């Protein structure tokens, strides 16, 4: 099946926006929240390897997206939980992500897809729960948008809102990452 006109443009733009938002978030959170900054940086690297022509193969791009999902997202949530005193959830999320990263080579493509989506949803739900209890509106929006990205990725449709499904998921991740960066900033202001 031939790609739809504009699909490559849409894909490149969604990767670029996710990369720029994540880079801004990494720089903004680097001093106060190194774990979250590392998670945002992994998203930047995954987007960059996809955008750079000849830099990597399709398999490398998939591996980068896998690492950004199973290690990067738990790193984002780690600091949010840790600062709010929920150290067991923080350690459990990060440990689970590390185990998934190591086990990824033993999973088939469908297994990696399900594990990545599950990790995305678990991170989204835990961020949402902490944000609700701490009344952090940006955290609520960030958790909700990460959850939307995870749920959209499970849909059977190839296109959503006239765009490829993966692009819509990246747009949702970009909005969620921006909101989560703001949530970390708000959280830091509350603790100062």
Curated annotation (Swiss-Prot):
Location(s), subcellular: Membrane
Intrachain disulfide bonds: none
Membrane topology: Multi-pass membrane protein
Keywords: Membrane, Signal, Transmembrane, Transmembrane helix
Signal sequence bounds: 1-32
Gene label: TMEM276
Record's protein name: Transmembrane protein 276
Main location class: membrane
Keyword Hydrolase assigned: no
Transmembrane segments annotated in the record for this chain: 35-55, 63-83, 89-109, 114-134
Species assigned in the record: Homo sapiens
Entry's Gene Ontology cellular component terms: membrane
């Amino acid at each position: 099946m031939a790609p739809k006109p504009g699909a490559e443009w849409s894909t490149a733009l969604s990767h670029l926006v996710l990369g720029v938002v994540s880079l801004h978030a990494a720089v903004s959170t680097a001093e106060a929240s190194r774990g979250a900054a590392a998670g945002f940086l992994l998203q930047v690297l995954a987007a960059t390897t996809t955008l750079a022509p000849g830099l990597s193969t399709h398999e490398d791009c998939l591996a980068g997206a896998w690492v950004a999902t199973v290690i990067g997202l738990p790193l984002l949530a780690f600091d949010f939980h840790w600062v709010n005193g929920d150290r067991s959830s923080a350690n459990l999320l990060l440990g689970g992500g590390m185990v998934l990263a190591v086990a990824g080579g033993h999973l088939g493509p469908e297994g990696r897809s399900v594990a990545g989506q599950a990790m995305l949803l678990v991170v989204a739900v835990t961020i949402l729960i902490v944000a609700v209890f701490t009344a952090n509106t940006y955290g609520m929006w960030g958790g909700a948008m990460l959850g939307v990205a995870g749920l959209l990725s499970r849909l059977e449709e190839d296109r959503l809102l006239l765009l490829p499904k993966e692009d819509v998921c990246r747009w949702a991740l970009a909005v969620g990452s921006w909101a989560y960066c703001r949530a970390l900033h708000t959280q830091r202001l509350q603790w100062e």
